[in-house]
Design a protein with these regions (language model features):
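Extended, charge-rich low-complexity interaction segments
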Residues: 108-115, 158
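Short hydrophobic/charged patches on amphipathic alpha-helices used for structural packing
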Residues: 38, 89-92
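Active-site-proximal alpha-helix that buttresses catalytic centers in soluble enzyme cores
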Residues: 2-82, 122-123, 130-133
Length: 158
């Protein structure tokens, strides 16, 4: 069983955005990254798409939703500022029911999920933090993540 953790694609500068941050959209570069992520995951057997409530996360998953015919579900535990254990536990509950989830979140939440999984015994192959549009492929066995593979962003950003 797999869980795919995706950091949202490029959304431009937070400091240059004068509205509520959760409404900040993807930049043109981010739109291209989102399409590349979709191309990479379209045939990954994903059953559900989960997103932080933030627009940039939902937009990151739109091309994958179009490619798979799935709807993007907003999941509050993936919102920026949340801790790793609740998000990880929600993802593991889905995996326990046999669902493959692709979840898009933020640069604080995803490393917290990875850190929680490694504290619980998962092996991490790659960096603990990834750039925008980077992702982790997590292998689940016996109710826990056992292996995490870091996949760099599609445009090679580091």
């Amino acid at each position: 069983m797999k869980i795919h953790l995706i950091r949202h694609a490029h959304a431009g500068s937070r400091s240059a955005w004068d509205k509520a941050d959760h409404k900040r959209p993807l930049s043109p570069r981010g739109e291209g990254q989102a399409k590349a992520v979709a191309a990479a995951l379209a045939d990954a057997g994903i059953d559900e798409l989960w997103s932080s409530p933030s627009l940039r996360c939902r937009q990151t998953l739109v091309p994958l939703a179009e490619a798979t015919g799935l709807e993007v579900q907003v999941v509050d535990v993936l919102d920026e500022g949340n801790d790793g254990p609740p998000a990880l536990d929600a993802l593991l509950a889905a995996a326990a029911e046999g669902r493959v989830v692709a979840a898009c979140s933020h640069g604080d939440v995803i490393p917290a999920v990875v850190a929680t999984a490694t504290r619980r015994g998962a092996e991490l192959e790659g960096p603990r933090a990834i750039s925008k549009a980077g992702r982790y492929v997590c292998t689940v066995a016996d109710g826990q993540i056992t292996h995490i593979l870091a996949v760099p962003p599609p445009d090679g950003d580091t």
